[in-house]
């Protein structure tokens, strides 16, 4: 199944041609590498596919409903939080659901609640949705992905501002993996990964 394609992509700045007549197609499950020397336009091509840069000419097709994740070489974070806080942003919807669940639990614990039946039905529906979305497993998934990228429990409270460039790249990759985009594009992410991380 075709999930992404490009046809006759060109990009130029004035008289400087960066990319010329690039065409390709990617099917579901494909793993594709873009190979070329520095300055060949690899990053420019990725930014065009991600929708962050307009081609001078040509077309990019992304299958309807598909989410594209794009990990850049630099400028990963502007956050002043910690490692665990940044990674946990992926699961904001679960935290919101948990707050609503807690509120409904208080409501249905009061048998004199005039909206008891309505709140109970809402609670049951929300719990089913929470379970189906992975609410009981996301915390272990979060910890596991961070560990796979070299962030053990002792680093979770480390300020992002204190991370090295390589650590920021690894954290950005972990966050991207947690988001589970349909199409994942990585711009030289292996520069700061060891063999174990690459295998994972």
Q: Where does each model-flagged region fall?
A:
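ABC ATP-binding cassette signature C-motif
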Residues: 1-200
